[in-house]
Amino acid sequence: MAKDIEYNETARRKLLEGVNKLANAVKVTLGPKGRNVVIDKKFGAPTITKDGVTVAKEIELEDPLENMGAQMVKEVSTKTNDVAGDGTTTATILAQSIINEGLKNVTAGANPMSLKKGIDKAVTAAVESIQKRAVKIENKKDIANVASISANNDNTIGNLIADAMDKVGKDGVITVEEAKSIETTLDVVEGMQFDRGYISPYMVTDAESMVATLNDPFILIYDKKISSMKDLIHILEKVAQAGKPLVIISEEVEGEALATIVVNTLRKTISCVAVKAPGFGDRRKSMLEDIAILTGGQVISEDLGMKLENTTLQMLGRANKVTVDKENTTIIEGKGQTKEIQGRIGQIKKQIEDTTSEYDREKLQERLAKLAGGVAVIHVGAATEVEMKEKKARVEDALSATRAAVEEGIVPGGGLTLLKAQEAVGSLKLDGDEATGAKIIFRALEEPIRMITSNAGLEGSVIVEHAKAKKGNEGFNALTMVWEDMIQAGVVDPAKVVRSALQNAASIGSMILTTEVTITDKPDKDAPNPMAGMGGGGMGGMGGMM
């Protein structure tokens, strides 16, 4: 395949056109008064969104050189979204400003490599300034504020996420699903839940709701099948003497062992529920170990030389309550040692850091949540499918932003933190083209606040100058159109989002500034049309088959 090669100014100018086309489409969504973008879909209804990364992902340009520029800026927003979950529009605006200002200087004769050094030094100074302004999240109200801002000032979503985080803790799992109704609701499963139900419906304690609820039970955790009654009879007798119910978690309970449990449960001799162990293979062993640590019991494993018939009550786990339905088992308030549970949580966190597989990370995260607090599900409801998709995307954004805020704290929002970082950049002692590189970042840092106010129908430059003169956290609230303390007004951004947006924008911006040659595939004008030659009659010569 022949290639098109462009050099110097021509190459950079085409890349810049692509950058501007994408950035101009994305930046209209910024701020509380940002506008929607409607995206046509080949199948189904069009998507209406105010999410920068969703807009960016849809953009493909016809000109291959322009498209290269657009794809590089798309990388800024997707990387920021992956790392921090929000701030994609801000990152795109910063990248556009860095690239536009930078290319003006390169055209005027500045050395691109020196500009890059200056940009890197300025970004380091700005990031330090952002981190200094960060305030740790103290309460539920702060979480609600962060989530509301990220969900485009939707307080309902903000409060739901704050409730969910409050209930399951920062290590808990919060998932987002589509609701069957138009209401958006929150369901919280406290304790450890896994997707295995009772082996026999005869084990239920409430025939109406078909649920088995056992209060203060013993929990037997065994990693093999139980089929022989003689293995089990000894422990059943001890549990019956103690006057407590029993939960059996094992690979399988079958044959005479199952029959004996069912008969004794129906006769009310003992209240016992058997469930299959969750997971498969090595993951099953890990999950059984988690349950054992949570309940203060032991996994009865023949690999460790333990036999089921020799099990004592001290080897069994305990919990305040266990509920089992047809599909799920929930262990509430396991009576394990806090120190051991914390040790296990630390171990899983380390595995999450070390793993390279996304699937493994997800499964480890689930295990962590089950040990640490629980699982919350936000059911997103809306009147139409189009609204549902848009709302669900906002909830997912808000959730990611909230996690980022818990991690690195919050900073004043509305573009104020980036604007105030100009002070740190301005105080750098640099010379020549490095100083010019720092000035490029200095100029870019005021672009987000300029765009937020511009989308609100005001003159951005005027607001920028006023904001520079203000002290502390006082900034312009584009939603209420007043000057106020941004933190007190609840206009906050996660520090991680602001930091990631700037670092990713500067990274891609520097790449484009230091580009000297572009190589693209040359369109093949003489390529044969695969449908030509078939003629208007389709598959000729088939008439005889009628």
From Swiss-Prot:
GO molecular function: ATP binding; ATP-dependent protein folding chaperone; isomerase activity; unfolded protein binding
Recorded superkingdom: Bacteria
Keyword Nucleotide-binding: yes
Catalytic activity: ATP + H2O + a folded polypeptide = ADP + phosphate + an unfolded polypeptide
Primary residence: cytoplasm
EC primary class: isomerase
InterPro entries the record matches: Chaperonin_Cpn60_CS, Cpn60/GroEL, Cpn60/GroEL/TCP-1, GroEL-like_apical_dom_sf, GROEL-like_equatorial_sf, TCP-1-like_intermed_sf
Cell location: Cytoplasm
GO biological process, one term: protein refolding
PROSITE patterns in UniProt: CHAPERONINS_CPN60
The UniProt record lists the keyword Zinc: no
EC number, UniProt record: 5.6.1.7
A cellular component term, taken from the record's GO annotations: cytoplasm
Chain positions recorded as ATP binding sites: 29-32, 50, 86-90, 414, 477-479, 493
Inducing or repressing factors: By heat shock.
UniProt keyword terms in alphabetical order: ATP-binding, Chaperone, Cytoplasm, Isomerase, Nucleotide-binding, Stress response
Pfam families per record: Cpn60_TCP1
Subunit structure, as described in the record: Forms a cylinder of 14 subunits composed of two heptameric rings stacked back-to-back. Interacts with the co-chaperonin GroES.
Function: Together with its co-chaperonin GroES, plays an essential role in assisting protein folding. The GroEL-GroES system forms a nano-cage that allows encapsulation of the non-native substrate proteins and provides a physical environment optimized to promote and accelerate protein folding.
Matches recorded under NCBIfam families: GroEL, PRK00013.1, PRK12849.1, PRK12850.1, PRK12851.1
Protein name listed in UniProt: Chaperonin GroEL
Source species of the chain: Leptospira interrogans serogroup Icterohaemorrhagiae serovar copenhageni (strain Fiocruz L1-130)
Gene transcribed to yield this protein: groEL
